[in-house]
Each structure stands twice: as structure tokens, then as C-alpha cells.
Amino acid sequence: MNLIPRVALFADTFHEINGAANFLRRLTSYAKDNGHPLLCIRSGCETRVSNDGSVRYLDLKRIRASIPLDGDFRYDPLLWRKRALVKRTLKEFGADVIHLTGLNDISQFGFVHAHFMKIPAVATWHTNTHEYAAER
């Protein structure tokens, strides 16, 4: 029995400059540095799968017409067209748990796949919404 769970991280933010993205980059670095298996599903410039040590990345390219939310942070209502790729990648990885990081398009993928694939999920929230909204 392997005591290290295989985690699929659905990262709504990753490349952007914000506290949540910084935390998620540090989390993936920790997994890589310690040889922990991690699948990180995130936005990217192109849709592709890549590996970096024990970390596998599934980058999903958003359409140009995706909805801007804040800075570089966007919502792609058509991202669902990639659901078969996400499901296949999750199955190949063999996730024990899904980690959701927000309410945006990529975490929505995670929530739906966790439900239908019967994979336990944990959700974290990295933004104090009231303070964040007050500053905008």
C-alpha cells in the first residue's frame, strides 16, 4: 500500500501574479522536490501534457474570447469541449484525490469529474473575497 496519495490539482490560477498562484506553484515544486505524484491541471498557452519529475501537467488553452475576470485571470465557457482529454488524463494518472482551488472553469472540471468518477475531493479557497472586493 502506497502511503503517498496521487493528487490531481485543478488550479484555476497558476501563471498569474497573485498569492493563490504563488501558493500553487510552491505546492507543485514541493511535490516535485519530494517525488510525490501530482497531476496539475491548469491553463496554458497551448493544450498539452508535459512531465517534470513526479509532476505531470495538463495545460488547457482557453479561447481568445474567454471572459476577463481580473488581470490575466479569465473564464472560458467553452473549456468543456476538452472534458474527454481531462477525463482520460485523470484515468491514466490514477488520482486518489482531487484538489479544487476555486470556483472558476478549471475547478469546475475537477468538481464534475470527482463526482462522476467517484474520486474524493478537497477544496481550498485562497482569497478573502470581501477584502479583495473592497480593494477593487
Predicted ranges, named:
Residues 32, 111, 115:
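Anion (oxyanion) recognition and catalysis
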